[in-house]
Amino acid sequence: MKIAILSREPNNYSTRRLVEVAQARGHQVEVLDTLRCYMNIASHNPSIHYEGRELESYDAVIPRIGASITFYGTAVLRQFEMMNTMALNSSVAISRSRDKLRAMQLLSRHGIGLPVTGYAHSTHDVPDLITMVGGAPLVVKLLEGTQGIGVVLCETQKAAESVIEAFIQTNNNILVQEYIREANGADIRCLVVNGKVVAAMRRQAQPGEFRSNLHRGGTAEAIKISPEERATAVQAAKIMGLDVAGVDILRSARGPLVLEVNSSPGLQGVEAASGKDVAGKIIEFLELKASRKHKPAE
């Protein structure tokens, strides 16, 4: 196959691994800087141009679109889809999962376990909002945040009121969530590929920190997940419409609680912790998806 990888960082571990594995399996791979792609949105002959040339057709595209460029990145991916290029994850599914509020509402509708989560617009409603999620301590999250940025643990009612009011008054959209104390600064990242958990790791926050993101100094180790956790991760990815996803789960007294469903999960931490060839599983699935697309009707 001829595969395009949309990535702003060709030397990023995840991008390099996908290139290496795909090439080792006989595929032709080109890494394209997402923001350098530009589009001709024509009715009969849509095209994508890159560095002064019109791109030839590809069999498949792997989107590695960062959260900060979701709008433009999904537009580029839609253009590939208009040109009948098969996408590892669809533009619709990526957009759905990147909207954290919408994602929470969809997961809630399907009965997936979640931390109690509040959303409000007016500062007049802050005291009741805090009560609604169980009071302090609680967690405030910027809807546009990523890698633990814009996530604040408020340990008292006064601190919670101040932080929430400050965010709202500066026109930031936030979620207010209950703090799951029994998780003890740890979460589980499940890598789901084609409806199966192919790898999992437990991420533990640094002492004095509650955010377990590896970008914030958290550590990772292999973990054996329960059947309920496995089913929750698979179902969460399915609800988002993602064939490849990183599903973040907290262990709580009332079972697994989903924090986030990531459409472009990093591979370095989970491959190192689990010892699993996740990149290989992704390329194998891409091959399977391509074979299904080109299989003649019976």
UniProtKB/Swiss-Prot annotation:
* Sequence positions that bind Mg(2+) 1: D248, E260
Listed InterPro entries = ATP-grasp, ATP-grasp_RimK-type, ATP_grasp_subdomain_1, RimK, Rimk_N, Rp_bS6_RimK/Lys_biosynth_LsyX
Binding annotation for Mn(2+) 2: E260, N262
EC no. given is 6.3.2.-
Q: In which residues is ATP bound? A: K141, E178, Y179, D187, R211, S212, N213
Pfam families reported for this sequence: RimK (PF08443), Rimk_N (PF18030)
**Residues the record lists as binding Mg(2+) 2:** E260, N262
Keywords carried by this UniProt record: ATP-binding, Ligase, Magnesium, Manganese, Metal-binding, Nucleotide-binding, Protein biosynthesis
| GO terms for MF | ATP binding; metal ion binding; ribosomal S6-glutamic acid ligase activity
Sites binding Mn(2+) 1 sit at: D248, E260
Which pairs of Cys residues are joined through disulfide bonds in the record? none
Q: What are the ATP-grasp domain coordinates in residue numbering?
A: 104-287
Gene Ontology annotations of biological process type: protein modification process; SOS response; translation
Which coenzymes or cofactors are required? Mg(2+); Mn(2+)
Gene3D superfamilies, per this entry? 3.40.50.20, ATP-grasp fold, A domain, ATP-grasp fold, B domain
Q: What is any one of the record's Gene Ontology cellular component terms?
A: cytoplasm
Give the note describing cofactor binding and stoichiometry. Answer: Binds 2 magnesium or manganese ions per subunit.
Record family assignment: Belongs to the RimK family.
Please identify the protein, giving its name as recorded.
Probable alpha-L-glutamate ligase
Taxonomic lineage per UniProt?
A: Bacteria, Pseudomonadati, Pseudomonadota, Gammaproteobacteria, Aeromonadales
Q: Gene name, please?
A: rimK
